[in-house]
Amino acid sequence: FSTNKSLITVPQKQDTKFTVSETEKDVKITTSEITAAVSLTTGEIVFTDKTGKVILNEDNGGKTFKAIEVEGTKGYEIRQVFQSPNDEAFYGLGQHQADEFNYKGRNEELFQYNTKVSVPFVISNKNYGILWDNYSLSRFGDSRGYANLDEAFKLVDKTGKAGGLTGTYIPSPRTNLKTIVRTEPNIYFEDLKTIKNLPKDFPLMGSNVTYEGTFEPQESGLFHFYLYYAGYMKVYINNELVVPERWRTAWNPNGYKFALELKKGTTIPLKIEWEPDGGDSYCGLRVLTPIAPEEQNKLAIFSEMGDEIDYYFIAGNNMDEVISGYRTITGKAPIMPKWAMGYWQSRERYKTQDEVVGTLREFRERQIPIDNIVQDWSYWPENAWGSHEFDLNRFPNPKKMVDDIHSMNAHLMISVWPKFYRTTEHFKEFDERGWMYQQAIKDSICDWTGPGYVGSFYDAYSEGAQKLFWQQLKDHLYHLGIDAWWMDASEPNVRDCTDMDYRKALCGPTALGPSTKYFNAYSLMNAKAIYEGLREEDPDTRVFQLTRSGFSGLQRYSTATWSG
């Protein structure tokens, strides 16, 4: 078994009494409430209550291991399957954007992205939960990734030609450019890499795009579709509107899922209408081919990389008791400051000190209740992201600003990113210790501020880097009297809209190992840095952090997560 310390769990204050018994068939571990019986033949574990009633059992062992090696680190692709009755429901998994609540029979990919928060915990209406102790990209349900349309169907364009769909690209009338018509073998333009496959030099802003033709399933069953969109999009299948118009801003696309029963060999019309939003925009339609319904409806979890299968079974008399068990394992949430429960005022940044203080003063003069005002990003000099310094041309006296806020009986929460421009002293402090992710620097990735500046994110998996991150905040912001900390982009989102392989390159390798293995827990480590720093500095003051990403255990750092 691995000797690595779990990032998710906390040490337990007391041991639970248990007994161990063995027969020719199994080994049983029994507590006062639960028995776990491990088959000596298959390794299958069956969990029963004290009356012998089965609560959960693995599916004939249900374990799959595939040996892999990533960046010199050995591990396994892993999957665990449990049996599940038809009337079971599953909830949890974090915060996803596809309008799903009960995950029974559904599929969900667990990775971190702006507005997508992945938590490897699922709770059942049968009053148990599974905490999956793994930090890599994971999948609930089907372990396969979504396939392109041409891998699952025979595609025919609107003229009857096999091999793809007809893509019609109508430019904005203001461009005086001609319409482009071409064959698309699949609809997969979902990131900065794949949008290069769109028509060259075609301006998406203000255009209208249509993909149409027919598709023929190569097998019968329930097909699960995944629509990826930025801008406005509709989908018609078999001449029926199956996805009414949806919209998403181009810099942060979204996914939507739907499923259809289809028959092998049938010819089915397909039409996708897309109005891109922005100069770069994204769209995609992919699919999972059918698996047997009894397989689709089981409880199954897959992870890209781990040392072993490691999960916690939590049982209770009701869901509250299961959640209590989850808190016991991952850490209890400290009581947050009372003021944090009050009214907040926030906007896409106040640009000056006068705006912040003046806005708060207006609330007080109008006798509108308010407890917290929020300073969003870009209060620093334009070329000094990560300096944690106010731009004195716009915020001439930050200490007075905070004091003025406090004098009006309010609090200030400030946005802090784990991002640093390479020209800042803070970047250099991390970099010289090997605590800065290097890929963005090597590729000279410029961000969207001003002319664009090159920078990267610090490695929050390093304990030394955590301490340095807090020390920099303490020296430059904490001493002003800041009341709360808004941890933005803590996925970490080094760059928007990159493909998954490049995302991993941008946020690794970590101090603990390859980013493939440690992909989802960055926000947990980042929150730990600030929480432990604050507790050491001022143990008698309650902590409040707001973070854009989350993971199991985040609550123990007095952290709330917002929708991004």
Per-range role (PLM):
Residues 94, 180-206, 328-330:
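Edge strands and adjacent loops of beta-rich recognition modules
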Residues 150-193, 316:
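Predominantly extracellular/luminal regions of secreted and cell-surface proteins
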Residues 6-8, 57, 256-258, 369-564:
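Aromatic- and carboxylate-enriched substrate-binding clefts and catalytic-loop regions
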Residues 196-209, 244-253, 507-509, 513, ...:
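Extracellular beta-rich ligand/substrate-recognition surface
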Residues 17-18, 198-202, 212-215, 257-262:
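Beta-strand-rich interaction surfaces with strong enrichment in secreted/lumenal proteins
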Residues 1-154, 159, 207-208, 222, ...:
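N-terminal accessory segment at the very beginning of proteins
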Residues 215-235, 270:
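Aromatic-lined ligand-binding clefts that engage carbohydrates, nucleic acids, or primary amines
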Residues 351-365, 465-475:
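Short, acidic/polar
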